[in-house]
Amino acid sequence: MIKLIVNADDFGLTEGTNYGIIDGHINGLVNSTTMMMNMPGTEHAVRLAKEHNTLGVGVHLVLTAGKPLLGDVPSLVSSDGLFHKQSVVWEGKINPEEVEREWTAQIEKFLSYGLTPTHLDSHHHVHGLPILHDVLEKLAATYNVPIRRCEEERAVRPFSDVFYSDFYADGVTEDYFVKLKERVQGEQTVEIMVHPAYIDPELVKRSSYVMDRVKELRILTESELPEGIELVKF
């Protein structure tokens, strides 16, 4: 039996995103999500998470969008006080100690709402940066949580055997989940990253990935898993 986690990234980005994720959970295949702690929809996401406790919720660690929670992390921000663009972060010119403090603050904010994180992942997969491996090891040990497997680098305390990020843009196809059995060996645990949402003005303002989120939501709520695949949580 293939064990499947369908994790919706960007919980907390906007209210429309939050409602899309919840709809994808109640009426579709989404059984896990990760929350951004520095976005306009964070408080709204917290309320929804508490109302829908069958949805596993982890922390979507942020380093490339919005403003940091801490004010004393100079290597992480541009002159405007916002996080660097992802191209800058991927150059590796950031201070891992500052990343550790900022990500700890994000996790602690999540905990302050009385929520228990199922796992950690990151916006734009920045936790795959080699210079952050030690930070991840420490966070995983401190909070006793697994971390999303990265395609790019060695995995740090992974939960799944396989991670797919290709249900995205042109990869959002009607038969994606039907064909999953052809790609996965039996008994493996698989995580698929998804981004369902309803469009609202804040999403258009903050993301270049917009229309396909609605398509994702439709497919996630219309698809059925083939025999031999079961949904599990972190």
Curated annotation (Swiss-Prot):
Cofactors named for this entry: Mg(2+)
S-S bonds: none
The answer to keyword Metal-binding applying to this record is yes
**Gene Ontology molecular functions:** deacetylase activity; hydrolase activity, acting on carbon-nitrogen (but not peptide) bonds, in linear amides; metal ion binding
Q: Which InterPro entries match?
A: COD_ChbG_bac, Glyco_hydro/deAcase_b/a-brl, YdjC-like
Q: Which superkingdom is the protein from?
A: Bacteria
Would you kindly state one Gene Ontology biological process term found in this protein's UniProt entry?
Answer: polysaccharide catabolic process
What is its EC class?
hydrolase
What does the sequence similarity comment in the record state about its family?
A: Belongs to the YdjC deacetylase family.
NCBIfam families xref list: PRK02134.1
Tell me the protein's name.
Carbohydrate deacetylase
